[in-house]
Amino acid sequence: MLIDTFTIIAICTLVLLVILSSVLNPFMRKVESAADADENEVAESEMPAVSIVVLATGTTETLDAHLSVLLTQNYEQPYEVIVVGVKGDLSTEDVIGKYSVDHKNLYSTYIPQRSLFISKQKLSVALGVKAAHNEWIVLLDAKDRPASSMWLRKMAAKMDKDTNLVLGYSNYDPEAKPYYRFDRLRNECYLLRKASRKTAYRTESGNFAFRRSEFLEQDGYLGNLQYVGGEYEFLINKFARTYGSRIAVSPEAFVIEDVPTKKAWFNRKLYLKSIRKDLERTSAARSLYVADLLFMYLNYIAIIAAAAYSGLTMNWILLGTSALTLILTITSRILSARKAYRKFEADLSLWTVVFYEFSIVFHKLSVILRYRMADKYDFTTHKL
């Protein structure tokens, strides 16, 4: 049987798209650069004193559960834990009082119940930084808990003299919806890789360290006080400098975030959408993300179109090629995901990878729709 020109072109196109969509995959790329290798870590004797700032606005129960892990870190150098709560929150004060009896490195400071022209989270960060006694500050939310007692040591191992930001990996508790955990992992692969390779763009959550002096010298959140969200994103985006960021991605450095509600998960997406236009380096960061999705969907569309056409025209060679490229695509994406799942210890089913990836665009559309329907004053502290 002779193969016509159209069939040859179609087969070549399918093969090319399979290759491109496999390469353009965040799970395929290595997250760490050579600079973040273990042999380049700071010696234990040279690790700095650290201040851990914990944001505890309305999270008393989780604060009580997580403080014990923070206060018993296996860290040889001095470190302090500063809890920032809301003034008048007696339950938070009780929790701090309970732990401060045995832990003299536990401190607290409080924000007023009402704050004008700045969100409570940003005000909490600013007060926590000012209350800190050390140059290096690690920022956490009370709903975050370190995965091990080695967490602080693994983060501090990246705090060398040439570094001003250290980003760690964070994901939701295994009880959270699998798609939420998949989405966080996929986004972290982009953000951690960018931080490790050149200049950090933003972060998905807490579990990062920065220098107190830079925060104070550059007036903290000045320039984005009008936004309710973005307390993590703006810090990374503003203070990141070229080749000045390092990442800590060993399992001991992981942080586990409590299970989010559906509303909380969507709110985080909405807040990000509201601030993205004011984040620097957005175009460069988004271009790779868009390219990955574009070629993934083009690949699937081409396979489906080729299969439908070949079935109608009884072009069995093209139909067989369509089936083969579909198998290769699914296999490639599962194997790439398995690599990332193992590295970040993600308890996710490999068989759901294709479905989760395919549904990304629908989740994006849902966020866009919610954002357009929302009151834009919900995203700003300046409501005059």
Predicted feature residues:
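Short aromatic/hydrophobic "clamp" motif used to bind/position activated sugar donors
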Residues: 137
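Catalytic donor/gating beta->alpha subdomain of glycosyltransferases that bind UDP-sugars
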Residues: 159, 165-167, 171-187, 216, ...
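Membrane-embedded multi-pass helical conduit in multi-pass membrane proteins
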Residues: 294-377
